[in-house]
Amino acid sequence: MRKREISLATGYLAAPFIREAKGYERHIDICWDAPEKDGLKYYKIYRSTDGRDFEPIGISRSWMRRYTDFIGTVGQRAWYRVSEVGYDLKESPLSEAVEAATRPMTDGELLDMVQEAQFRYYWDGAEPASGLARENIPGRGDMIAAGASGFGIMATIVGIDRGFVTRAEGVERFLKITSFLERADRFHGAYAHFMDGPTGKVETFFGGKDNGADLVETSFLFQGLLAARQYFDGDSQEEALIRSRIDRLWKEVEWSWFKQHDDSPYLYWHWSPDQHWVINHPLIGWNETMITYMLAIMSPTHGVAPGMYYSGWASQEKMAHDYRAGWGMTEDGSAYKNGNTYYGIKLDVGVSNGGPLFFTHYSFLGLDPHKVTDRYTNYFVNNRNIALINHRYCMQNQGGYAGYGYDCWGLTASDDAWTYHAREPQPYHDNGTMAPTGALASFPYTPSESMAALKNYYRNYGSFLWGEYGFRDAFNLSANWVSPLYMGLNQGPVVVMIENYRTGLIWDLFMSHPDVKRGLEALDAIR
């Protein structure tokens, strides 16, 4: 966040207006209106259980006009008041009191609750100049992430469709987003991993070599944009403008440039305007990058031959074999196809025993795995089996980690108590850290196991795991640790994949795009 002069004058502090208090099964959300003030340090929240005697229970940062009170029981009534506190620690008068109560909720209502809370990460928590997603909250306030923004675009479509915000509000947000994307830095049509929200300039967060295009992050972004292009199908000038902007941006991505040279069998992850291919990272599956090859094949202007799916993504070359064996630490799946059985589940495709669960999420938020079948497998079946292997590994709990079981599972990438790590169902990639997105973004594959995890995380761990933007990024009961962050790459897949499980909305939108249809037909022709 940019530094600014802070006024210590607090004479203008005033009681906020609480516009809503809403009870859920185990918590109550309150939100209020108050103008921005330089001298404001935080909001102070008070609660009463009798409507008369109020005690302070917490604070909310000056930019957050919402507070989640996790009560932990059903049928509890509470009253709330809020004040403003300045940098000199003087306090405004308290707001008028509002009341709400926790209540029993159906499974459908619990899904609504999770989707709406995690949607707010991208709506209330968006970087204001661009309307796009921050890498994490709290974090670097002006820095946005292209991939997380693509996930947020799809989550926002869900939010509009479910009435969390109006369509008119959604149109306004997407006009801001597409306007920003038109003026942001691009490199042969592709975006950087990180950008500055106010200026659109590259943020070299991962170092000076990563100062240009990131083709994988661009793919996640365009997976969302193509779904949005299909969603905003109205006759208004505003919706037509959204469509035309997305069409133009889509056609300007030079996917074929990222082959590095004309006879390359691979696409490459990065390109730098002054260091060119210095990172030199070819895209080889099985991992999260299938969508990159798919979009490159689908492009109507700068596409690659459909055969690159097999020469690059599913390559049988020695380099690809060594790449897979190296990161997987095994020969299993090093030829792309696997064929082994783990915990009683046969795995057609995947390195080791399937890898982290985000491999089954990121490429398949818009791309419907039911409708993707290659020479080796159908990807809904394969993704479901990867999720089931992950679930059974966690039930077996070889490491003896606290909490693991039928309703606590889903090893994937997240922060942990020590670093950021992509965890998977292997002892050497497991340290007891669980990210809620693992199980919850797997709803289409494992609805019963995912619902069990949702209820466990909310009902039993919600006092430390649930907050204003839904579930926090990760927790480790053995290490007595919970992440202080919400992460843009992990909040969105939960919203989107729950919706795909419930209605297939985002799958249907993305798959309806004419270029998507044409690209998949071209792939089917060489299967």
List the predicted regions and their residue ranges.
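Extracellular fibronectin type III
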Residues: 2-7, 85-104
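Proline-enriched interdomain boundary motifs that mark the N-terminal boundary
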Residues: 10-19
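Short, solvent-exposed loop/linker segments at the N-terminal edge
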Residues: 20-24
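Conserved aromatic anchor
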Residues: 26-39
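Extracellular low-complexity, O-glycosylation-prone stalks/linkers
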Residues: 37-56
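Short S/T/G- and acidic-enriched coil/turn segments that sit immediately N-terminal to beta-strands
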Residues: 63-68
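Beta-strand-rich modules
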Residues: 69-90
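Ser/Thr/Asn(+Pro)-rich, low-complexity disordered segments
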Residues: 99-527
